[in-house]
Amino acid sequence: MSNLQTRIITAIVLGTITLWLTWVGGVGFTLFSIAIGLAMFYEWTELSATRQTAFSRLFGWAWLIVTGILLILDRGALLTIGFLVAGCAILLVTQWKSGRGWPAAGLFYAGFSALSLSLLRGDEPFGFTTIVFLFAVVWSTDIAAYFNGRALGGPKLAPRFSPNKTWSGAIGGAAAAVAGGLLVASLVAAPGGWGVPVLALLLSIVSQIGDLAESWVKRQFGAKDSGRLLPGHGGVLDRVDGLVAAAALLYLFGAIFAEPDVPSAIFFSF
């Protein structure tokens, strides 16, 4: 079986599970988001092992688990974010000499990713539509960038740390993301105008930046993949890097322009 076939099969299985949990919502999706965050943190600590100490690992795991519990108990977005930021600050101060910010960055990256996904799904009637919109934008970006880049080739996007990505792939991915976002919006009769395509484009760009940033991190520690959990995709970070970056941006937009506890309302506020 070729790597492409393995990659497609893994994507189909993961996509099916993800969409089902998205449909179910509630605690099930919150637990799913927390599981993603925990897997991300595990891979981050393994990648940056030379910058970790026993304290940073133990503290990070404990703080991340409590952050997850706050999400499950629905204690409020601002309280949960404040708790997460406090933990990151403690790690930053106490572990700066040995970690140079890597332990704190890993905790925030994993924790805020789980928080963003969980709160975006949140309550009905907006949550399901918003998460599907996010998935449509990010998955359209990934698929179109991959095949467009392979078909057209051309100048490299970031050859120093991601030699396979091209400008043609990035542009094709962004165009597909706008189309995917508009399709979801049209199916749910979301408001028209410029808001949806602009948001889809921004999310696509940030998704690709998230992908490149994760590639940069791996290069810093001489790793090709973040892990081996997902056949054809490497690790969890390799699969969700773009998704969680876009989710974080979408959550921030929702928290600022709608409500921190119901960020999905941004999707219907254009």
Curated annotation (Swiss-Prot):
Keyword Kinase part of the UniProt annotation: no
Catalytic activity, as annotated? a 1,2-diacyl-sn-glycero-3-phosphate + CTP + H(+) = a CDP-1,2-diacyl-sn-glycerol + diphosphate
Q: In which pathway does it act?
A: Phospholipid metabolism; CDP-diacylglycerol biosynthesis; CDP-diacylglycerol from sn-glycerol 3-phosphate: step 3/3
Q: Which residues form a coiled coil?
A: none
Its gene name is cdsA
| InterPro entries in the record | PC_trans
Q: Which Pfam families match?
A: CTP_transf_1 (PF01148)
Origin: domain of life: Bacteria
Organism of origin: Brucella suis biovar 1 (strain 1330)
Question: Which keywords describe this protein according to UniProt?
Answer: Cell inner membrane, Cell membrane, Lipid biosynthesis, Lipid metabolism, Membrane, Nucleotidyltransferase, Phospholipid biosynthesis, Phospholipid metabolism, Transferase, Transmembrane, Transmembrane helix
Q: Locate the transmembrane regions by residue number.
A: 19-39, 53-73, 76-96, 101-121, 126-146, 183-203, 248-268
Per the record, the major location class is membrane
List the EC numbers from the record: 2.7.7.41
For this chain, the family text in UniProt reads: Belongs to the CDS family.
Any GO MF annotation of the entry = phosphatidate cytidylyltransferase activity
How this chain sits in the membrane, per its record, is:
Multi-pass membrane protein
Name recorded for this polypeptide: Phosphatidate cytidylyltransferase
* Record keyword Nucleotide-binding present: no
Q: Any idea where this protein resides? A: Cell inner membrane
GO CC annotation, single: plasma membrane
One biological process term from GO is: CDP-diacylglycerol biosynthetic process
